[in-house]
């Protein structure tokens, strides 16, 4: 109750206490209790929960144990904490049953004691950037016609020594330069920003005020692979691209 009064929007606990879970459910706040065994997961399921904290993650077998527990409990998702850091963060997040990770490296105790919120912001931002892994994947240039696209691609190939690959709608020089065969998005062209997790990247950027064009969404095997921002930047259309 004190946590909610202080502004908490969800509760995470190191272990599972049915009374605490039931109280959170009564007051309407999401709760993620700690579970590291099959018996504890059974308790969580009996309380109607399908997302649990996995703690202490590294000490009880880490990702190997989570995968073993996921085999019989196919509907359960995990939030591992305990021993998670920037080195192993992506290894955990790459497993589909893990919805989030927690780690104390993001909230250094010395910074907390000193109320150095800027330092904590820097640490947490670094963790988010590590997770999302943004990088420039390719630049699309509106050549306008198939002939011009090929001409432009060959010209850049002479400069860079990269191979040319002709496709249905565009011609690539290497993998970084795409020449469009007909007018496409963006006054000047488009830029693809690769990310490790496109759904997480979208949510993160929406919190920063960016909007996306859902009609531009491209799915493969039921998974979102690409989506454009609604607004251009410097005359370029930008889109996220799942790595």
Predicted regions and their residues:
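Catalytic cores of alpha/beta
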Residues: 1-6, 39-47, 71, 84-100
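Catalytic beta/alpha-barrel core
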Residues: 1, 8-16, 30-41, 50-58, ...
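Vicinal oxygen chelate
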Residues: 121, 171, 175-182, 206-243
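C-terminal helical cap(s) of enzyme catalytic domains, especially alpha/beta-barrels
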Residues: 24-28, 110-132
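Amphipathic alpha-helical segments
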Residues: 145-160, 200-209
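Surface-exposed amphipathic alpha-helices with a cationic face
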Residues: 4, 21-26, 45, 66-71, ...
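N-terminal beta-strand motif that seeds the catalytic metal site of vicinal oxygen chelate
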Residues: 128-153, 186-193
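Glycine-rich phosphate-binding active-site loops on the catalytic face of alpha/beta enzymes
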Residues: 14-20, 53-63, 97-120
């Amino acid at each position: 109750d004190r946590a909610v009064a202080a502004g908490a929007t969800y509760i995470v606990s190191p272990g599972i206490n049915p009374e605490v879970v039931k109280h959170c459910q009564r007051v309407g706040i999401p709760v993620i209790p700690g579970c590291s065994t099959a018996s504890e997961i059974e308790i969580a399921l009996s309380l109607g929960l399908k997302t649990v904290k996995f703690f202490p993650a590294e000490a009880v077998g880490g990702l190997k144990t989570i995968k073993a527990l996921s085999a019989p409990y196919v509907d359960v998702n995990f939030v591992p904490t305990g021993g998670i850091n920037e080195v192993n963060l992506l290894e955990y997040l790459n497993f589909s049953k893990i919805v989030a990770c927690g780690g104390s490296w993001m909230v250094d105790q010395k910074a907390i004691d000193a109320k150095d919120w800027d330092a904590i912001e820097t640490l947490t931002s670094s963790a988010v950037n590590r997770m999302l892994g943004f990088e420039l994947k390719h630049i699309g240039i509106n050549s306008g016609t198939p002939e011009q696209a090929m001409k432009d691609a060959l010209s850049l190939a002479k400069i860079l020594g990269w191979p040319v690959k002709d496709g249905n709608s565009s011609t690539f020089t290497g993998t970084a330069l795409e020449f469009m065969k007909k007018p496409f998005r963006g006054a000047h062209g488009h830029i693809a920003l690769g990310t490790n997790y496109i759904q997480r990247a979208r949510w993160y950027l929406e919190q920063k005020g960016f909007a996306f064009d859902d009609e531009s969404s491209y799915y493969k095997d039921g998974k979102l692979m690409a989506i454009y921002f609604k607004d251009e930047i410097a005359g370029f259309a930008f889109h996220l691209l799942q790595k």
